[in-house]
A protein has these predicted regions:
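A short acidic/basic microdomain associated with nuclease active sites
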Residues: 17-44
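Feature for intrinsically disordered/low-complexity regulatory segments and propeptides
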Residues: 1-11
């Protein structure tokens, strides 16, 4: 039998009460209630970070958990950990936080809260380490060619010279993300493009929203399966491409 949405939400409610947490909750329902995404933001676990070496504004980051059910047509439920950015309401997931807890509909799900609860504190520690990482990325200023090289390595995104018209959807997406980057720079009070601006623009593209046009370039999606797929792709990009690039730069490398 398919996993009932209420079983997941009740288990999460039990878990949250046990931990004495008061998250901000946003719920999305799909297919007449048979599929869902619920976003739990744990703001009491977050903090402000500076958005660049010359940035004039801070932003608030905190751990969050996304609870998905039947997101891929196979009646699979999953909890995904991410970092919530209050400036643009993005959810920033990494490869090592994408599958906090995964459950097929053929398995008993009654113990979800117990299993998750036994690991939740260490999981918050892991997400707070990601917040530290994101803050360090705000100190890495990068040039146009670095931006292009990074964007071209996102699955499903291509990038054209801005003097040429975008033809394919992947190119149009690349152009939208590139335009979003400069909006991020201005909004965050930065002097130049830094790695944080790029990550924020890309995670605009991968964050599920009720109104997909809620940011100026309409990068977001309100489709459950598309949103989860993008989140997976961007999580891999952050972990496999951006993190090594940043580590190299912080160590004094050029590439």
């Amino acid at each position: 039998q398919p996993i009932n949405n209420s079983v997941i939400t009740e288990n999460m409610f039990q878990l949250i009460n046990q931990k004495g947490l008061i998250p901000h909750i946003t719920a999305y329902e799909y297919n007449n209630g048979s599929a869902m995404a619920v976003r739990y933001q744990f703001k009491e676990k977050g903090r402000d970070i500076q958005q660049g070496p010359n940035g004039t504004k801070n932003t608030f980051l905190c751990p969050e958990i996304w609870a998905y059910n039947s997101y891929d047509g196979t009646q699979t439920a999953r909890l995904t950990g991410a970092v919530y950015d209050s400036a643009c309401e993005n959810g920033i997931a990494f490869k090592n936080t994408i599958n906090f807890y995964k459950l097929k509909h053929t398995k008993n799900n009654a113990d979800m809260a117990y299993i998750v609860g036994s690991e939740l504190d260490s999981y918050f520690d892991r997400l707070n380490q990601q917040i530290n990482l994101l803050e360090s990325w705000a100190n890495i200023e990068i040039n146009y060619m670095d931006t292009v090289r990074l964007l071209e390595k996102i699955k499903g995104v291509s990038f054209l010279d801005r003097t040429k018209p975008a033809k394919r959807q992947a190119e149009k997406t690349g152009d939208k993300i590139h335009s979003q980057i400069f909006g991020e720079v201005k909004k965050r009070g930065q002097e130049n493009v830094n790695l944080w601006s790029i990550v924020s623009a890309v995670t605009n593209y991968s964050t599920l929203r009720e109104d997909k046009g809620s940011n100026i370039h309409g990068l977001s999606t309100n489709s459950l399966n598309v949103g989860v797929s993008r989140q997976e792709n961007v999580a891999s990009w952050l972990s496999n491409i951006v993190a090594p690039f940043a580590e190299n730069r912080l160590a004094g490398g050029l590439v």
